[in-house]
Amino acid sequence: MEHEVGMDADISDFTLGADGYVRIWSTEAIYNTGNPEYANKPKQLASMSNHSGTIHTVRFSPNGKYLASGADDKIVCIYTLDANPPSHASTFGSNEAPPVENWRTIRRLIGHDNDVQDLGWSYDSSILVSVGLDSKVVVWSGHTFEKLKTLSIHQSHVKGITFDPANKYFATASDDRTVRIFRFTSPSPNSTAHDQMNNFVLEHTISAPFQNSPLTAYFRRCSWSPDGMHIAAANAVNGPVSSVAIINRGSWDGDINLIGHEAPVEVCAFSPRLYSSQPVSKSAVDNQNHAMQNVTVIACAGGDKSLSIWITSNPRPIVVAQEMAAKSISDLAWSPDGKCLFATALDGTILAVRFEDGELGYPMAMEENEKSLTKFGTNRRGAGIAETTDGLLLEEKSKAGEIKDVEGRMGALMGDGHATAESMVNGKTAPLPSNGATPARGPSPAADTQKAQPNGTAATPAAPEPEKPDPYQAKLERLKQRPTYTKDGKKRIAPLLVSGAGAAESSLPQARLMASVSSQVKADVPQSIVDLSKPFDGLPKGGLSALLFGNKRKLAQLEGDEDGHVEKRVALASQNGATPILANTPDGLLPAQPQPAPTGQQPTPEFIRPAVTNPCMAISQLRLAVPKVRSQIVRAIDSNGRPTEPPSATGEPGKSRADVVFEARNPSPASLTGRAVDREPVRLTLFRGEQPLWQDFLPRTVLLVTGNQSMWSAACEDGSVYIWSPAGRRLVSALVLEAQPVILECNGPWILCISAVGMCYVWNVKHLSSPHPPISLQPVLDAAIHTLGAHPSAAPAITNARINSEGRVVVALSNGEGYSYSPSMYTWQRVSEAWWAVGSQYWNSTEAPVGNLQSAGPQQDKETTAAVSAGIIPFLERNTTNETLLRGRAYFLQRLIKVLLSREGYESFESSVSIAHMENRLAAALSLGAKEEFRLYLSMYAKRLGAEGLKMKVEELLKGLIGGLFEEEDETGTGRRLQANEKEDRNWQESSDTLCGWPREVLLKEVILALGKHRDLQRVTVPYAKLLGVVDNESEDNDAMET
C-alpha cells in the first residue's frame, strides 16, 4: 500500500513510502523503461525500514541534502546520503536487489502523540513542519532538527501542509474544516526554541470553502502555486459538490472552485514551473524582461480514483484520467522540470505520467519564478558560513549570553532571590528580596531637606514613615499556614501557588509608572475631576446674523395647549412692557414655575459660577474649556511629595495619606459694600494635619492650584499666576497670561501652565527662568486643518498634559495621539499615534520588559529621586490604545491595512511599519532622556535588524553608537559645543562617552552580541567586536551580556 511520493531537486531520484519501507527510485531508469540500454540498470536505489508502522509521507528537502519521512509510529525520520557505498547486500530473507545508494538515518524526531500525516520543507530548507492526527503542527529546525515550536491551533486532525515559495507563510489543512495561514521568518542555522518564541504566528483562518466538507478523507494535501499567488485547497465543497478551492494570497478569500470530481479531492499539486503558451523566445519577452502570459498547472486527485490536470488559462481541465487505480489516489509529485507527474494510490499503484512539449505549455526558466516572487520580498537567505574563527567565537558568545539572559528572566519570574542580587532603589543599590517581597522604598532626598516648617526653617532629616502593612500579604501568610486533614486524620499544610495570590509587587526592579498594570491604571486617573464649562465661541450658533439680530427660541409644545394660549400670554406681557420669565429646556422655552423658599442649612455649592472669559478668545483660532469657579480648591501631597487624595469633608483624616494640604477658598458672589467689585478676598492656607502653616490672601478668584515640596502655585481668573515657597514667601511677582489658565501642573521645580487660547508656559522656580518661549498647542490640535473651514469646528480634546523632571511638556489627546515638546528643536514631536497601534508588531510589547532592566553602568546620581522620563512613552501608547478602542477607529484602520496587505507592492508593509515604530520609539526615548526605555528599545531594534538582514541600517546603527568613543580628543578646542537649549548625550553623532545616560561601550557591546549570531552580518559586526575586545580577549568573563 503506497501512501506518499516525493521528488528530489536534481530529478534523478524519487522516493515512495510504503508499509514500513522508504524506497528511493531512479527516475532516469523509469523514463527509459522501453530502452534496452537501461534494462540491466537498477530502478530501486535504496530501501530503508526504520519505521515500525505505515509510512504516510516522505519529502526531500529543496536543497537535496535531506529526506524526511513520517509514519503512524508518531516518529519523523531524517535521512542523508552517505558518499560511501553501502556496506551490506540485500536484506536477508527478501528478494530485493541490493542497495545502490547508502542512505543513513541521522535523526529520529519525537514530537507527535499520534500518526504523522504530512511533512513540508520551507523553500530555503531552513525549517521542516510536520502535522498529524494529534492536531499539532510541529516546527523543526532544518539545520539542527531541534524542535523550535509546537502550534496547537487546530481543533481536529491536521492532514496537509504546504509552503509559500516566497518563504513568508505556510498553510495547514485540518478536519476542523479550516485552512490556517501562518507567517514566519526563516530562522538562522543556530536558532533555538527561545529565539523563535514570537515566530510562526497565525496570520489568517479560512473556513468558508470547507463548512460542509466530509471528514472521511484520508488526506487534505494542499499546494501553493509557484508564483506565490494562490493556494489550492483539497476537500472543499461548492454547495453539494466536491471541489478544489483556489485561495488568493493576501485577501485569503476563495472565489474560484475547480469542480468535476465525484468524490472528495484529497491531494492537489501545482507544477513547480511557470508555463508559456508558446515557445520562449526574445519576441515573447516584454520591456521589463518578463515573459508574457505565464500560466500555472495544477493536478488534482482523490477518492474517485481519477486524475485531473488544470491550467489557469482554461476554465475546464485539459486532462481527465479516470480509474487510475483500484483505490483512492493518496499523493502527487511533479518532477522539477514540470514534464512528469508521479502518483501513488492506496492499492500500491505507482503511476508516472509524462507530458510532451506543448501539451501543458512550455516551461519557463526558474529565473522567471524568482522574478514573479520578488514583489513579495522573498526571503531565501542561505545558511551562511562563518568566514573566520572570530565570527564563530562571536556567535558562540551571542548564544551563551542569550541563554544566561533567559535563565535570569525565568529566575526573576519564579521569584528566585539571591543574596548577591541587587536592585536599584532611588539610584542606590538595595538587596533584592526573595519570595516576591517588595523592598521598602527609601525616602526622597527632597522630602528630607525641603519639608516646610511653621517657622520657615528646614528641619533635620526625619525617619521615613513605616509602610502600612499589606492586607493581601497578611492574607497570603494565613493561607500558607492553613492546615488540611487527610482521610486517616493526619494534619497537612495545603500547598499554595504563591505567584497567583495576593497583590504584592514583583521582586523585579521597577521603573517609575511601570510597577504593574494596576499601578499604571491608577497613575492615569486624575487626582480630581474638574467640572469644565463649554469652550467659549466667538460667534453664537447661527453665525454673524444671530449675533446681530438674535436667535430666538420657540416655546415648547405643551399638552392641552394646541391653541397656543401660553405663547399669546407671553407675547401680550411683552407688549405691556413686562419681562416674562421663561425656563430654557431641551424641548424649548417654558414658563418658569415658582420655587419654594429654601429652608434649613444649605450645602456649599461645588462651583459658584462660570469663569469670565477673556475677549481675546473671540478672535483666537484655538479655544479650550475653562474651569468653573469652585468654592474650594484643594491640593494634597504625601510625605514623599506625591499628589494624593485630600482629607474628606466628613472628618475622617485617618483614611487620607496627605501630609500637607494646600487650600484655596473662593468667596461667595455677595458684595460687602453693595458694589459688585467689593467682594471678600480669596483665602489660601497650607495645612499639615489640622495645623495651618501659613496663610495668604488674593484679590482675584482662583481657578487652579498645584504644588509640591519645592513650591506652591495658584492661577487666577484674570490670567495671573502666583508662586510661593514652601514657607509661604512669594518668589516672584504675579505672572500675567493672555487668557484664563485651564491646566496647571508641576514636577519638582518646574511648573506647566496652559491658557484658554492654547499657549503653554513652562517655568523653572529654582532658577526663575524658562527653557523656551511660550509655545502654542495649535500644531498639536491640528489647527492647520480645522481652521480651513468657514466656521470653527471641533478639534481633538486634551485628555492629559504633564511635565517631566526636565521640564518637557507631554500632551495626550482624545484622538489617541501623544506629543512632547523638544526645547532643542523648538517644535512638537509626535510620540504615539493610532497608526502604530494597528500596523506595528511591537505594539504593547514593552510594559513588562521595561521594568525588568537593571542599571548596567555606573550608579545613578544619588540626588536623582526618579528616572528621567521613565514611563512616558508607554503612558502615551496606553492612551493611544484606550482612545482608539473607545472611538472605534482601530476597526477602520485594521480594514485599511488588511486591504493594503493584499495589494501588490505592500508585501513588506507590516515589517516596514514595525521597524519604523521601533525607530520612532528609539528617537523619542533619546529625545526625552528615557534611560531604561532607550536601552530596551535599542535591544529590540537591533534584534529585528539582524533578523531582517538589513546591513546598511546595522552599519549605520553601530557607527552612531560608537560616536566619538575611540576618537582622539580635540586639543585645539575647536570641537562642536552644545547650545544653551541642548542636553548632553542626546545625540548619536556627538563625541560624549555616554548616550542617553548609558556608556556607549556598554550599548555597543550589547548590540554586537545581539547581532553576533547572524552570519550574514558578521563582516560588519566582527570588526566592532575586535575593537571592543569581545573576541580577542580570551580571559574575559564568558558572561558577555552582563555589564
UniProtKB/Swiss-Prot annotation:
Q: Name one GO cellular component term.
A: nucleus
Transcription is among the record's keywords:
yes
Q: Where is this region: Disordered?
A: 424-472
Q: Name one GO biological process term.
A: regulation of DNA-templated transcription
What parts of the sequence cross the membrane? none
Any single Pfam family the record assigns to this protein: Hira
WD repeat positions: 1-35, 50-89, 111-150, 153-192, 214-257, 260-320, 324-365
Keywords of this protein's UniProt record, alphabetized? Answer: Chromatin regulator, Nucleus, Repeat, Repressor, Transcription, Transcription regulation, WD repeat
Main subcellular location: nucleus
Q: Which PROSITE patterns match?
A: WD_REPEATS_2 (PS50082), WD_REPEATS_REGION (PS50294)
Where in or outside the cell is it found?
Answer: Nucleus
Q: Which family does it belong to?
A: Belongs to the WD repeat HIR1 family.
Its biological purpose is as follows: Required for replication-independent chromatin assembly and for the periodic repression of histone gene transcription during the cell cycle.
Protein known as: Protein hir1
Please give the organism: Aspergillus fumigatus (strain ATCC MYA-4609 / CBS 101355 / FGSC A1100 / Af293)
